[in-house]
Amino acid sequence: MQNIDQQELDKFEKMAKSWWDPQGDFKPIHQLNPLRLSYIAQQANGLTGKKVLDVGCGGGILSESMAKQGAIVTGIDMSSAPLQVARKHALESGLHIDYQQITIEEFLQNQTALFAERGEDEKFDVITCMEMLEHVPDPSSIIACCKQLLKPNGVIFFSTINRTLKAWALVIIGAEYVLKMLPKGTHDYDKFIKPAELLHWCDEAQLTCLDMVGYHYNPLTGKFWLNKDVSANYMASFRIQS
């Protein structure tokens, strides 16, 4: 059984055409992307020449920005329409990004033989999985696969939403209904993930947390910022336990 939720895929299929419209359904991601790109590059000690896997890449906003910083990017997703948008936009942007419609579990299976033949160098220096864990039935499986695809000294990044009343008020009521930053029904509160749950799954996968930050939005300025408050949206970086 594939680790996908068809209803979740359908949501993003419907929104695919507006993926690269900075004023469309994905406006918050366009606004957030420079901040998260900077965080990823800082935590990973730069992206130039590094092999990067973007899990749940969607229409390619993060994938393209990492490629522009010199990363060798592979993006995987199970939504066909967003991937078509991603491929077209990368072509128009003159970027080579390997986009594949595949689950991470299947991708890992395909890569395992390559690792056995060519060694650890075929693994990834950086893996990103942003705003994706809260949209799948089994987040722990995604995390375990990411670990197996990572080089020994690589860095993994996860971002998701805390399961708190504050997150419900800000992300669902505020962003979807009041500010209309996101289409209604984009998020399901029951699928939000507490930091303790993320840390537990990562520990099971033998990953250790390097850093965890919350990111916050000011609707008056349209700007995001980072701090240590992880009561709503947050992201974290991990390495393989030594």
Curated annotation (Swiss-Prot):
Please tell me where S-adenosyl-L-methionine binds in this chain: R36, G56, D77, M130
The molecular function terms of the Gene Ontology recorded here are:
2-polyprenyl-6-hydroxyphenol methylase activity; 3-demethylubiquinol 3-O-methyltransferase activity; polyprenyldihydroxybenzoate methyltransferase activity
Question: Which reaction(s) does the protein catalyse, per the Swiss-Prot or TrEMBL entry?
Answer: a 3-demethylubiquinol + S-adenosyl-L-methionine = a ubiquinol + S-adenosyl-L-homocysteine + H(+); a 3-(all-trans-polyprenyl)benzene-1,2-diol + S-adenosyl-L-methionine = a 2-methoxy-6-(all-trans-polyprenyl)phenol + S-adenosyl-L-homocysteine + H(+)
User: Which sequence ranges form a coiled-coil region, renumbered to this chain?
Assistant: none
- Which InterPro entries is this protein grouped with? SAM-dependent_MTases_sf, UbiG_MeTrfase
Pathway info: Cofactor biosynthesis; ubiquinone biosynthesis
> Per the UniProt record, which EC number(s) apply here?
2.1.1.222, 2.1.1.64
Sequence intervals crossing the membrane: none
Look up the record and give one Gene Ontology term from the biological process aspect: methylation
Q: Which UniProt keywords apply?
A: Methyltransferase, S-adenosyl-L-methionine, Transferase, Ubiquinone biosynthesis
Q: Which family does it belong to?
A: Belongs to the methyltransferase superfamily. UbiG/COQ3 family.
Q: What does this protein do?
A: O-methyltransferase that catalyzes the 2 O-methylation steps in the ubiquinone biosynthetic pathway.
Q: Which PANTHER family match?
A: METHYLTRANSFERASE, UBIQUINONE BIOSYNTHESIS O-METHYLTRANSFERASE, MITOCHONDRIAL
Record protein name field: Ubiquinone biosynthesis O-methyltransferase
> Source taxonomy lineage?
Bacteria, Pseudomonadati, Pseudomonadota, Gammaproteobacteria, Pasteurellales
Gene transcribed to yield this protein: ubiG
